[in-house]
Amino acid sequence: MHLFHEDHFTYELPNGWCSEGSGENLLIYDPNGNGAMTISFFSIFDMNKSLDEHISIMAKKFVEKNEISLYGPLILCGSKESKLTLYGTGVTSDKWFIKLWVIARYPRIAFATYQSEKKTSEVKKYDAIISRTNFAT
């Protein structure tokens, strides 16, 4: 099912999944699943760094502030012409699994996190959702 959030972000959900959104926040989940994804939306007003540097700094600040232990380095893919995606996985300070994605196409950024008590194959479904997201032009 193809959906729009606030006329500027498109995403697709598997059958039976739910999304709830208002303003600059969106929640996506499988009612019978293990975890949920929250997405917050931002706009860049002053860009004094490249887009990849900008989203890298955002992600690193989030990781530090929330005391997340990453399993490895953050990975950047995509292009600034379509969309850049920075992602990584780790555990929160209370030992929950977390995956984060920062999806960007200037001037918009979507910051998504998925959390569950433990890592399961469900995270692959969230990866698929993220891979099919787009910013409306």
Range-by-range predicted roles:
Residues 2-57:
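Secretory pathway targeting signatures of secreted, lumenal, and periplasmic proteins
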Residues 12, 32-34, 80, 103-109:
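Short, solvent-exposed coil/turn segments at beta-strand boundaries
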Residues 17, 110-137:
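Surface-exposed amphipathic alpha-helical segments
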Residues 19, 28, 38, 98, ...:
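Short hydrophobic/aromatic-rich beta-strand segments that constitute the beta-sheet cores
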Residues 22-26, 82, 107-108:
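Beta-strand-connecting loop/turn residues
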Residues 30-34, 90-92, 115-117:
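Secondary-structure transition/turn motif
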Residues 58-106:
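Signature of long, low-cysteine stretches enriched in small and polar/charged residues
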